[in-house]
């Protein structure tokens, strides 16, 4: 879920914090990508006749095809991707996970009815709702990335939190995910739609964390409280308080504790045993691996290894796999030039440097004039 309604709220309150961009504008950038979100996209998008792609044994291969070709597209655009995988979810997320399980059960029942009725549109819709990224999907993706020479990070907990930590440490430029809580975790830049297929023709949406805080007039701590009021993965919001009202309350009272003192409890229903303080702590001090201990390196692809991985039981076309491996190698060699702004830095002039230079120039001119004047003796004027 991320943060309920945050994207629209930012667009309404501070549209200057969002800009649309083309994927090619991130040439030379290192980007931390929410791997689970990507795998989910690939599982629901890479389909043949309404079903996921599988091998002869019925094992799903959609996620691998998506990961392979979408990563190549990123590399071809000069982006250096770092995939970040989820670890164990925090206990506070159990409520949200239970809701997701319940929604899948409802989708399963709806799918059965749609199948009986022969309603293909509904069958496809509910099939998508049943998609879940498994541990096996993640492990296969890690094996593939290793063969492609692309680094990945296993987060101890939430992938978005780890991505944000990498951004804050300067290890990467941005977080790429569809979940808005990357901003709540403090990612300086959030990129949405970066891993969407080219066929969808959707521009990359770039969110600036600094501009979001400035636009809302909130500190990072206050912004976290706003996100909790909106509703997050760790706890529900307060019934009756929508995005606009939540923003007004935060601007007036600055924290949830004061809001709870001031609001009319008869008008607004506060959840029983509301664990907003736990949610706040998870955003302020998330469990992440120390970015300084993570070495992010991109290697040459293992072409033969990729062929063995794809062309055995998974039955991919060998020529296409080898072609993909060669594209990765070509991208790696072209990326060595990097971005121009990584080579040149603007160094501010020391105080007083410019006036001194002008004074020196003036003195030099005077000296030259003196010398010239001395040399004109005995010369015929022109």
Curated annotation (Swiss-Prot):
Secretion signal: which residues? none
Q: Where does the record place Basic and acidic residues bias?
A: 96-115
Per its UniProt record, the required cofactor names are: Mg(2+)
Give binding positions for Mg(2+) 2. Answer: 179, 181, 233
Q: Where is this region: Disordered?
A: 95-118, 353-382
Tell me the residue numbers annotated for binding DNA. 47, 70, 158, 231, 233
Tell me a GO cellular component: mitochondrion
Residue stretches in coiled coil? none
Q: Where is this region: N-domain?
A: 1-104
Q: Which residues cross the membrane?
A: none
Q: What class of enzyme is it?
A: hydrolase
Molecular function (Gene Ontology), one example: 5'-flap endonuclease activity
Q: Tell me a GO biological process for this protein.
A: base-excision repair
The record's subcellular locations are:
Nucleus, Nucleolus; Nucleus, Nucleoplasm; Mitochondrion
Q: Which residues bind Mg(2+) 1?
A: 34, 86, 158, 160
Origin: domain of life: Eukaryota
- Biased-composition ranges, Polar residues, are 364-375
Extract the ranges annotated as region (I-domain): 122-253
Q: How is the cofactor bound?
A: Binds 2 magnesium ions per subunit. They probably participate in the reaction catalyzed by the enzyme. May bind an additional third magnesium ion after substrate binding.
> Region Interaction with PCNA: what ranges?
336-344
- Record key words, sorted: DNA damage, DNA repair, DNA replication, Endonuclease, Exonuclease, Hydrolase, Magnesium, Metal-binding, Mitochondrion, Nuclease, Nucleus, Phosphoprotein
Enzyme Commission number, as recorded: 3.1.-.-
How this chain assembles, per its entry, is: Interacts with PCNA. Three molecules of FEN1 bind to one PCNA trimer with each molecule binding to one PCNA monomer. PCNA stimulates the nuclease activity without altering cleavage specificity.
- Quote the function comment for this protein: Structure-specific nuclease with 5'-flap endonuclease and 5'-3' exonuclease activities involved in DNA replication and repair. During DNA replication, cleaves the 5'-overhanging flap structure that is generated by displacement synthesis when DNA polymerase encounters the 5'-end of a downstream Okazaki fragment. It enters the flap from the 5'-end and then tracks to cleave the flap base, leaving a nick for ligation. Also involved in the long patch base excision repair (LP-BER) pathway, by cleaving within the apurinic/apyrimidinic (AP) site-terminated flap.
Name the family the entry cites.
Belongs to the XPG/RAD2 endonuclease family. FEN1 subfamily.
Please give the name of this protein.
Flap endonuclease 1
Q: What is the lineage of its organism?
A: Eukaryota, Metazoa, Ecdysozoa, Arthropoda, Hexapoda
